[in-house]
Amino acid sequence: MAFNKLSIENLDLAGKRVLMRVDFNVPIKEGKITSNQRIVAALDSIKLALSKKAKSVVLMSHLGRPDGNKNIKYTLAPVAAELKTLLGQDVIFLSDCVGSEVEAACKDPAPGSVILLENVRFYVEEEGKGLDASGGKVKADPAKVKEFRASLAKLGDVYVNDAFGTAHRAHSSMMGDGFEQRAAGLLLNKELKYFSQALDKPPNPFLAILGGAKVADKIQLIENLLDKVNEMIIGGGMAFTFLKVLNNMKIGGSLFDEEGSKIVEKLVEKAKKNNVQLHLPVDFVCGDKFAENAAVSEATVEAGIPDGHMGLDVGPKTRELFAAPIARAKLIVWNGPPGVFEFPNFANGTKSIMDGVVAATKNGTVSIIGGGDTASCCAKWNTEALVSHVSTGGGASLELLEGKTLPGVAALTSA
């Protein structure tokens, strides 16, 4: 996929209305935002547009899954209030995202206006599908999708996309239909910069650290990365499927992925063919149940895990074993924790990898943390500033690493 896209930095925005797709899909409990991280992440692009004397910045985003219905539970109103505080200037919140009233409000706003539209997913035309009032599946009428996109296009003169978290979706607000110039915002740009380092011409040694539960979910990721990396660490629930197939290990009640097990040997074959060193755990920290208060025991690959116990983290020997490839890597991509880091007794494996990645970064290694759970690990241990890049998109970063084209990126104007 081509990563070289037109950037907001290279646009002349003076006197222009900027329609910007952002990712304000923040967690909200009882009308209160519990983490404003995604709003903070969009501030740089908004401020840059304003400093370039844009007439207005019109922001559009989704929140949650209203499935094409106007569900007040998913209103962006609390986001408008938070954005006003963070920006230190007034934010005009519109109670819709398309239609004549919205078009009128965005036609000739006061210079320097920041306008936030209501949730784009209140319309089935955003995702192209949704649910009707009785919960039945509905598909959007293509003519109405065209109309929806045309109404959005009337709200700005230039289109900027800064929503990497949704870049793997070909949704209406992500495509910039009707705009001559479609540019990447600063956040999206940063994501592309780091992922192009990993996927275009990576330095050696390039290490991938992969965790997560199912091999089947990560087949494409492993396949694609085996063509690029020099070493690969496999941890998490996924490791048990590998070890049962390869070593006939007794895994007790640990996760086993029947579907994924069929492809393990093929993946190992590919690793050998490509000269990729695979690192699998040699010991585990186990629990008698999947719970924070589980009784803790240890097990090795040779001895196996007894019935009634499950592996929930990698053990001390494995932590030592994994430290060496991390220390020698020039580039690290990490997607998925090696253990159940949410439970303190089973967090040491993930913490030791995190410590290793932070130390390597300090020594000049480029470290890229895939979104989702791995990004949560960085938040948990306050290491966001101690690694090179924490991705804002779990699904989008995964699809990029799988070698897929992201529609939201492909739609942007080439640089």
Curated annotation (Swiss-Prot):
ATP binds at residues 213, 218, 237, 311, 342, 373-374. Its EC number is 2.7.2.3. Pfam families: PGK. It catalyses: (2R)-3-phosphoglycerate + ATP = (2R)-3-phospho-glyceroyl phosphate + ADP. One of its GO terms (biological process) is glycolytic process. One of its GO terms (cellular component) is synapse. Its cofactor is Mg(2+). Keywords: ATP-binding, Cytoplasm, Glycolysis, Kinase, Magnesium, Metal-binding, Nucleotide-binding, Transferase. GO terms for molecular function: ADP binding; ATP binding; metal ion binding; phosphoglycerate kinase activity. Its main location: cytoplasm. Disruption phenotype: RNAi-mediated knockdown is lethal. Glial-specific RNAi-mediated knockdown is viable but eclosed adults present with locomotor defects. Neuronal-specific RNAi-mediated knockdown is viable with no defects. Conditional RNAi-mediated knockdown in adult glial cells results in reduced lifespan due to neurodegeneration. Conditional RNAi-mediated knockdown in adult neuronal cells has no effect on lifespan. Changing residue 388 to A: In strain: HFL97_3e2. It comes from the Eukaryota. AMP binds at residues 213-214, 218, 237, 311, 342. ADP binds at residues 212, 236, 341. Enzyme of the glycolytic pathway. Glycolysis is essential in glial cells but not in neurons; neurons rely on the citric acid cycle for their energy needs, and on lactate and alanine secreted into the hemolymph by glial cells to fuel it. PANTHER family: PHOSPHOGLYCERATE KINASE. Belongs to the phosphoglycerate kinase family. Monomer. This is Phosphoglycerate kinase. It comes from Drosophila melanogaster.
